[in-house]
């Protein structure tokens, strides 16, 4: 905000002011206003009529300043009044801007006694202004008025004196009084100075005491801190000592346990080595390798499907020849106990298996017997077929086996799948295993076995069934190297049911009395032998022992063993290794338990054998396999019962 300016019309302003304050001049008032549109102050008018004339020159649209001289009858000198006129029609913004100019205007016009603010003529009252001047509210000092008074004093007349004679006593009292007060004043100053020094000393002493106390407190805190640190350090050392002792004790215990563990491991290793050596020694004492038995049986089973069957009187029923090929019963395989399976999965069992492999690879295979004559191979007898079936069935036992509940043969009617499978297997094995030198005594025994088979099955004709004796004979007695009561049948035969019609004539049935019959067992003893499942003896460890077969030729019929049939099959076609090989060859699919007794490779060989023989129907296998495990057969130790059994043979 810009202030009032006196530079533009300064001379005019001062000239009018001098005219008013000079006593010789007749003018007693002057009126000032702003120049249009600016803050420059200028002279508007002046006159000699006093307040009455000045009040008539104020305008309502402007801001104006009136300087007037008022004479009082009681005062010797005139009084000066400054009137601040703000018209009623002046804008508010202009009023605010000019409000700060009043002080500067009063300073410019020196000697102003009273400042009167007015916005109308009624506000300018000569009586009110005179009252304010007489009450002493106006200023009494002014540079102009001071000069005027000095001028009046110079013109004044001299006055009389007021001197009086000096009194010594009074003067001494005055002097003494003054000295006393001066001395008192000095003493007071000294006292104050001493008090100030004492206060300063007290403050210094207090500060020193405070600092000393703080130092002592700091030392006490440091002492307590050091004591605490010492306690902590001592506790830490004790803790470390305890931890070191605990670590030593633990290390000592670990060393003791480690030595004990090492001793146990060494003892276990020695025991394992002794078990391996013992197993190797036991395996080395075996005359034959059980693995070769499974190979031979597998090859016989694979080749039997491809061979062409010769018509026999017992297989001329409609559908019997087809069912015999479709329903082939799997050869029973011995199962393993849980203890054997758990042993095979241990490192000791693995070492035993490796030792078995080494011993097996070092043993030469048994020599096969001479091949059978061509006549009997081409035209096998049904009696020999049934005998081969009964003789091959016990050879499937290779160790102690726990027979499951479902192993018992269910009741079968005429033409059941199990009976057809029995005839099919007998016929095919008879083709492969025809006897080399038929004997009269052996033929008698074979004749009885054929009669027993015809009695157990219902697939033969009624006329043939009538010619067979009803007594049941223990077929296990025909097993070579087995002795009396060595084994019993696994299934219970049922009485045959005659078929509805006679489809096989007597002319097709061979004469059964061409050889001398063997004396039959008593009826009670035969039934007890067939039906007693609780007294089954354990078969020997090996079944393919040529020496045992030769040694017991009088008690059993001399039939060609499996190696002879195997030799014939190898001359015709070399089959692929199948799932029944005991760990020497890798299983093709690894799903023997889910796909059935025969693996996929055997099914392929059966498919190839069908091309060789157009008369043979496609084989049908069962999907439910026997619950056995033959993967680690050689790793199983020979039980004591088997050793005693072999010793008895």
Swiss-Prot record:
Keywords: Acetylation, Actin-binding, Alzheimer disease, Amyloidosis, Cell junction, Cell projection, Cytoplasm, Developmental protein, Differentiation, Neurodegeneration, Neurogenesis, Phosphoprotein
Signal peptide: none
A GO term, aspect molecular function: cadherin binding
Entry's Gene Ontology BP terms: actin filament organization; cell communication by chemical coupling; cell communication by electrical coupling; generation of neurons; in utero embryonic development; maintenance of protein location in cell; neural precursor cell proliferation; positive regulation of dendritic spine morphogenesis
Gene (name only): DBN1
Known role: Actin cytoskeleton-organizing protein that plays a role in the formation of cell projections. Required for actin polymerization at immunological synapses (IS) and for the recruitment of the chemokine receptor CXCR4 to IS. Plays a role in dendritic spine morphogenesis and organization, including the localization of the dopamine receptor DRD1 to the dendritic spines. Involved in memory-related synaptic plasticity in the hippocampus.
The protein, known as: Drebrin
Compartments in which it is found: Cytoplasm; Cell projection, Dendrite; Cytoplasm, Cell cortex; Cell junction
Residue numbers bearing the Phosphoserine modification: 141-142, 337, 339, 345, 416, 601
